[in-house]
C-alpha cells in the first residue's frame, strides 16, 4: 500500500468531512398556506398595523423612527412595501430590529422572526389579490 494510507503517521484522513447542503425546499402550496396562516395569526394577535402610506420626501432615519413610535410599534418589526421605495428602505435599514421587504418577496421565516408587521393599504390590496 501507500505510505500515505490513513493508518500511518502523516497519512491521509480515513473518513474526512464532506461538504453537505442543508437546503430545504417547501412546496408552493405549503408555503402559501403557511404565509396565509401567519398573516391571519398576526391579525388575531394585533401584531399587524396598517398605515395609509409612507410619504417620505427624503432619506431620513429619524422620520422612520418617528413614524414607528407614533404607531406604537415596539420590538422587531417587518415593514412590507407594495413596490420598491428607496426613501423608506434606506430610512429603515439603520434601525435595529426593523426590516423592509417587498410584498412579493415575503417569506415564512421573516413573518416568524419579526413580531410586528407594518403594511400600507396598497400592500394589503396586493396581499388580498395573491393570498385571498
Report each predicted region and the residues it spans.
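Extended polybasic, low-complexity segments that bind anionic RNA or targeting/receptor surfaces
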Residues: 16-132
Amino acid at each position: 500500500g501507500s505510505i500515505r494510507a490513513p493508518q500511518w503517521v502523516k497519512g491521509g484522513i480515513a473518513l474526512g468531512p464532506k461538504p453537505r447542503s442543508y437546503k430545504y425546499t417547501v412546496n408552493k402550496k405549503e408555503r402559501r398556506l403557511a404565509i396565509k396562516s401567519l398573516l391571519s395569526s398576526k391579525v388575531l394577535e394585533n401584531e399587524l398595523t396598517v398605515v395609509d402610506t409612507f410619504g417620505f420626501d427624503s432619506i431620513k432615519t429619524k422620520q422612520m423612527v418617528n413614524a414607528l413610535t407614533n404607531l406604537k410599534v415596539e420590538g422587531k418589526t417587518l415593514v412590507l412595501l407594495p413596490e420598491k421605495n428607496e426613501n423608506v428602505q434606506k430610512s429603515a435599514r439603520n434601525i435595529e430590529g426593523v426590516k423592509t421587504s417587498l410584498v412579493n418577496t415575503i417569506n415564512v421565516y421573516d413573518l416568524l422572526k419579526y413580531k410586528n408587521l407594518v403594511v400600507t393599504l396598497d400592500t394589503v390590496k396586493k396581499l388580498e389579490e395573491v393570498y385571498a
